[in-house]
Amino acid sequence: MIMSSYLMESNYIDPKFPPCEEYSQNNYIPEHSPEYYSRARDTGYQHHHQELYPPRASYQERQYNCASIPEPDTPRGHGIPQSAHLLTGKGQPASCETPQLSMSPATPPAAASACNQATPEHPNSTASSKQPVVYPWMKKIHVSTVNSAYNGTEPKRSRTAYTRQQVLELEKEFHYNRYLTRRRRIEIAHALVLSERQIKIWFQNRRMKWKKDHRLPNTKVRSSSSSGSNTSSAAGAVAAASATNTGAPDELTGAQHAEDITRL
């Protein structure tokens, strides 16, 4: 019943919305006309709402005005007072966002000027960033340690100059062991302050020199000569077997010829 009487009231004032042309670019909706707020409501509408909700003492009688609201006491030095947020005049709002909007277009030129000032100081920064950085470990290096004065080119192999003490210790080790194990090689490298690669190369060269001094055949040459002798002996055996096989049929033919003569 309450809703039906509410809808059937002919004196109910419909809300009036302004046309779309009055909207500004900042999506600000202007206020309604003072006539919309000043008109009194119908008694029947108030009567039904008084039955549902208890009435308030000063809500219907007191008229609020945006310009007559007292300003609260604000401490000094705390920014813009609250009166700037209230409505002044005939619906012209005083918004605190206006200084921000006015200052915002000025900030990008300042940033652009700062970038323009920074670019002359480093003109080659963009050119260097485009070129890939090539580190020393990305190139092939034959030396064991990286030289501090590396200029980007591949250095040549340098011949290791062993000291007299290092050569003496290596000769002693070679006298007892011509071939080193990995563990013994690491121990000698730490003792003589050399790398494992240098120890390995020195022992390879020393073994070749020892074979040359003692006139020992090379391992590869000896294996090829032994394989050649094996092939020659196998060929001789095959030839002998073929000779014996060819001689046997001749003897058989001679015996058969003798038997034929006796029969005649």
Curated annotation (Swiss-Prot):
SMART domains in the cross-refs: HOX
Gene Ontology MF, one: RNA polymerase II cis-regulatory region sequence-specific DNA binding
Pfam families attached to this UniProt entry: Homeodomain
Gene this chain is encoded by: hoxc4a
Residue interval(s) of motif Antp-type hexapeptide: 134-139
Low complexity bias locations: 102-114, 223-248
UniProt-recorded name of the protein: Homeobox protein Hox-C4a
UniProt DNA-binding region: 155-214
Subcellular location: Nucleus
